[in-house]
Amino acid sequence: VSQVVQAAGLAKGTFYIYFKTKEELFLELMSGALSEFFQELNQSLSQKEIDLEGYVDLFVRKFHKDHMLIKLGALMAGVLEQNTEEEAVKKFKMNLVCQLTNAAKLLHERFPVIDEKQAARMILRSYSVLLGVAQLIPSTPIQSRLLEDPALEVLALDFAEESKAILRALWASALLLSPGCG
């Protein structure tokens, strides 16, 4: 909090007028990052020529492993929602539901075999995959150096490559196994 108020040129007391805890600030940052993501996703889905490959590429590109949605998403349930007023968490979740619903509607229009409820679940599943893959990617210089050892080479993963492979399989199976696919 001290660094934030100093960078903003505010007094610490002013911060607490707007946010009761630092977690509420992080929740607000997460909300803003999600809004930005959904805006870009919805714009892309509005382009009728986007196919499954293009959708997966967009999703992974937007969630680069250093992106705020990955960093804050990993803290969501365990940290951010623990020290936050219930009303702030509810506001965040209601906003998320609204954005998910809008994106799911566009996904259903683009891929009609997936109903809107399933489309919303698939977005959440896709995000879960990216959070999981990001946890396996080295995040410190020491971890990165260790993976240069040929004996540890099998552990060296590329975020985009691994994420795309998993999401392609996930989405292809959803499209193939949807009730509308006879």
What are these regions (language model features)?
Residues 7, 24-44, 98, 102:
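Alpha-helical structural segments
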Residues 111, 115-123:
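Membrane-interface starts of transmembrane alpha-helices
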